[in-house]
């Protein structure tokens, strides 16, 4: 079950964290994985690790916020079956403390970046007889996160795009779903703690973990496992749906 043999998958934000875990798992399940990330060095490291595991993988440095670059990337990759829109950035701030520049930056990557990938990928998926799109939303789209105004807004848009795409391209054989993670222990979290709480990283990590009802953060591999299911033939009857993976966060905050 959950095999991706003979499938080609494009994964944005694949250089670290959740995207890296998805790329590694998809490759282990037989897919030819195209890892896309703004950080070329991170891409190459993922490629090395996947090839050491005998996986098929190609790396691409690309800024998803630049439509022309994304279009060229998709054309260069050629026919593919799966698109995972995972690239994104975070920002801390309320509506009145978020600058226009920061708001635009978050929207450019988290919303326009997804749009750019959809715009370039859907014609290829349609021509290929269909495929699967998986967008990375967030619990922030469901409940809003305190002092994450721009991020919550952007992820709400991603969830809306998921619904729209699922409806518009159902007859083309394209399925589209999204995942809404809660807190996930990624290098981003470690970097955030190191920058903001030097010397107190372990203490603050424990505090952040306790904000999750289940008592810990998710691991990237857990999110990747859900992504694999949704992109496999076993999920062929599922489209237009968001899947929280949040340790009970949404249930206890709505």
Regions found by a protein language model. Name each.
Residues 118, 154, 162:
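Active-site helix of classical SDR
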Residues 138:
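Residue(s) in the substrate-gating loop at a strand-loop-helix junction
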Residues 8, 15-17:
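Conserved glycine-rich cofactor-binding loop
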Residues 143, 228, 239-254:
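Short C-terminal tail/terminal secondary-structure segment
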Residues 123, 167-171, 236:
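Alpha-helical segment proximal to the catalytic Tyr-Lys
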Residues 94-95, 99-105, 208:
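Substrate-binding pocket helix/loop in short-chain dehydrogenase/reductase
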Residues 66, 178, 186, 200-234, ...:
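C-terminal helical subdomain
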């Amino acid at each position: 079950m959950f095999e991706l043999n003979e499938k080609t998958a494009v994964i944005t934000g694949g250089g670290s964290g959740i995207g890296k875990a998805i790329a590694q798992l998809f490759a282990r399940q037989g897919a030819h994985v195209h890892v896309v990330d703004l950080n070329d060095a991170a891409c190459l490291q993922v490629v090395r690790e996947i090839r050491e595991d005998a996986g098929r993988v190609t790396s691409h440095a690309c800024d998803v916020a630049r439509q022309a670059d994304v279009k060229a990337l998709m054309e260069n990759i050629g026919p593919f079956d799966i698109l995972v829109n995972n690239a994104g950035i975070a920002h801390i701030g309320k509506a009145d403390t978020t600058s226009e520049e920061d708001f635009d930056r978050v929207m450019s990557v988290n919303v326009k970046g997804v749009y750019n990938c959809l715009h370039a990928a859907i014609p290829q998926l349609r021509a290929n007889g269909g495929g699967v799109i998986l967008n990375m939303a967030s619990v922030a789209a469901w409940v809003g996160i305190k002092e994450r105004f721009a991020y919550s807004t952007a992820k709400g848009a991603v969830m809306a795009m998921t619904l729209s795409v699922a409806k518009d391209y159902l007859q083309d054989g394209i399925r589209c779903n999204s995942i809404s993670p809660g807190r996930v222990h990624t290098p981003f979290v470690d970097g955030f703690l190191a920058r903001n709480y030097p010397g107190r990283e372990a203490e603050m990590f424990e505090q952040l973990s306790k904000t999750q009802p289940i008592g810990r953060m998710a691991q990237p591999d857990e999110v990747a496992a859900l992504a694999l299911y949704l992109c496999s033939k076993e999920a062929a009857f599922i489209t237009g749906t968001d899947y929280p993976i949040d340790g009970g966060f949404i249930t206890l905050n709505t």
